[in-house]
Regions:
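Conserved small/polar residues in nucleotide/adenosyl-binding loops
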Residues: 268-269
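Amphipathic, coiled-coil-like alpha-helical scaffolding segments used for oligomerization/assembly
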Residues: 118-150, 203-262
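Interfacial loop/beta elements and low-complexity acidic/Ser/Thr-rich segments
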Residues: 1-166, 172-197, 254-256
Length: 269
């Protein structure tokens, strides 16, 4: 089974004019990370009973900006599309990968998952369309309840001393690999998967990762007062510290960090 991208001529009309059945998803709000696609049936369809768990051959599927779509069959991912547009579901074609902005990383994830699932040609009894929110998930506040040790280093003069720092701010994250996010975290949900199911856990892990991330910045001989102005360096250090827990195990990554001035510094050594 595969997806065929609709031609330019098809883009001018409505989905209802082009296909017997079609799936779409309205713009996903900031609190929804994944939502099941809504199935619409037109007068041209013979599937008048409208079984929501079957995707008919020739169905239309729309993907909007800020979304990634997958099709699952019996809980296994069989299609992925991260490029905005309108597509036709074709059961006679090979699986397709429209990776969009995710590039080769998404293709590689799909190939890995596809090896675990061979489609035998029979019509599945549970086929679903899911849409992922690929926009930045905003307004994740954080703060250090306890001081973090920070090594102030000046290699030129051979100086090194440890200070205690506290920091707070806001970060954003993105679903950087929807296939890992689905297979490792949310799975075959009935309707949608929202951020409140994981945000508390993410906040704890984010704060825990600040210690190694700030340690990496200390190696660059940055002083605590300089760090709020080094947002890109801090983001890279945080993603490195969270590589296993977030990127590899959940398919999410830090997008941006806004750090308030670091306060309450005390010299330890």
């Amino acid at each position: 089974m595969g997806l065929i991208k609709a031609g330019i001529g098809a883009l001018g009309g409505t989905l209802a004019d082009q296909w017997k059945e079609f799936f779409y998803c309205d713009a996903l709000p900031n609190d929804v990370l994944m939502r099941r696609g809504q199935k619409q049936i037109t007068g041209r369809s013979s599937n008048t009973k409208g079984n929501d768990n079957i995707i008919s051959n020739g169905s239309g599927i729309a993907v909007a900006d800020g979304q990634c779509m997958i099709i699952v069959d019996q809980g296994k991912i069989v299609e992925v599309c991260a490029e905005p547009g309108e597509y036709t579901f074709d059961t006679s074609s090979e699986p397709s990968i429209f990776s969009g902005k995710f590039g080769e990383s998404l293709k590689e994830s799909f190939r890995t998952l596809w090896k675990r699932f061979t489609y035998g040609g029979d019509t599945g009894k549970d086929q679903r369309v899911y849409y992922f929110n690929t926009k930045e998930i905003l307004n994740n506040k954080f703060g250090t309840a306890n001081p973090i040790m920070f090594e102030v280093v000046n290699k030129r003069i051979g100086m090194s001393r440890t200070v205690q720092v506290r920091c707070n701010g806001v970060y954003t994250y993105v679903i950087s690999d929807p296939l890992v996010f689905y297979s490792r975290l949310c799975g075959n949900v009935a309707t949608e998967f929202t951020r409140d199911e994981i945000d508390a856990q993410l906040k704890v892990e984010f704060v825990d990762a600040l210690q190694p991330a700030l340690g990496a910045l200390a190696e660059q001989e940055l002083r605590p007062a300089q760090i709020p102005a080094k947002a890109n360096e801090l983001k890279a250090a945080m993603n490195d510290a969270l590589k296993q827990e977030w990127i590899e195990n959940r398919g999410i990554s830090v997008a941006k960090i806004a750090l308030n001035p670091i306060t309450d510094r005390k010299s330890v050594v």
